[in-house]
């Protein structure tokens, strides 16, 4: 029994890039890398500037949005046109369907979030490549966890994009900035802790790396 179905993977890719979501998936990394180039030209190799760009824009905005766009486009077309019932009626385990869809979403995160994060980090801090590597690895953990969370939303509601945006704005954004304890239940903060440890930064205070990794694995 295959854990991943190539046919379902192809359908997943088509459902993402055959709609407006595919355009946004290309725009977001271009914005990140473009702003990194601009910041480098204006302020040089600034530690503060690189953190604002890679964390404030990359981990907080680009990574979760890429994951949301990728996962919301995987099941929505089948649910909207009713073909999901035919897909579920096929002699394919549901676990294979879910894993195949998640593979597509995670691949999108790697291609449109993690790789651009690495490139942006190298542009901003050529003197310290560990910064780029740290944020890229953090985006892998965070992006994969977001894919798992948003995939669940796409199954339970047809308004996964709206619910996902509310979650990002309220929990990860508003409450995450106001309440210090939210870091223990924040995917973005778990990602930042990985970047902290690899690059020697202090984006998130008093959050053990083992907890961040374990929490991410639990969500996935």
Annotate each predicted stretch with a short phrase:
Residues 1-26:
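Aromatic- and glycine-rich beta-strand/loop motifs that create alpha-glucan
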Residues 2-10, 95, 99-103, 133:
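Alpha-helical membrane-protein architecture signal
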Residues 3-7, 178-203:
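Short hydrophobic, aromatic-rich alpha-helical segments embedded in or entering the lipid bilayer
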Residues 21, 191-195, 211-212:
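Alpha-helical transmembrane segments of multi-pass membrane proteins predominantly involved
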Residues 30-77, 81, 98-162, 166-167, ...:
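Secretory targeting signals
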Residues 83-87:
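Short cytoplasmic-facing helical segments at TM-TM junctions of multi-pass membrane proteins
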Residues 163-173, 189-196:
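Membrane-spanning alpha-helical segments of multipass transporters and channels
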């Amino acid at each position: 029994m295959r854990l991943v179905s190539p046919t379902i993977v192809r359908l997943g890719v088509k459902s993402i890039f055959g709609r407006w979501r595919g355009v946004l998936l290309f725009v977001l990394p271009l914005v990140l890398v473009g702003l990194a180039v601009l910041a480098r030209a204006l302020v040089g190799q600034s530690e503060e500037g690189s953190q604002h760009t890679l964390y404030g824009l990359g981990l907080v905005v680009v990574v979760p949005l890429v994951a949301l766009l990728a996962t919301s486009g995987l099941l929505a077309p089948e649910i909207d046109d009713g073909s999901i019932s035919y897909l579920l009626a096929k002699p394919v385990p549901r676990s294979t369907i879910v894993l195949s869809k998640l593979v597509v979403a995670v691949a999108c995160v790697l291609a449109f979030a993690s790789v651009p994060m690495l490139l942006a980090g190298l542009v901003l801090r050529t003197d310290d490549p560990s910064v780029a590597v740290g944020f890229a690895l953090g985006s892998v953990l965070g992006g994969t966890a977001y894919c798992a969370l948003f995939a669940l939303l796409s199954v339970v509601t047809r308004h996964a994009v709206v619910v996902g945006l509310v979650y990002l704005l309220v929990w990860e954004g508003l409450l995450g900035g106001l309440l210090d304890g939210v870091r223990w239940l924040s995917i973005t903060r778990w990602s930042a802790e990985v970047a902290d440890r690899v690059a020697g930064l202090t984006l998130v205070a008093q959050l053990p790396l083992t907890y961040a990794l374990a929490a991410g694995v639990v969500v996935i």
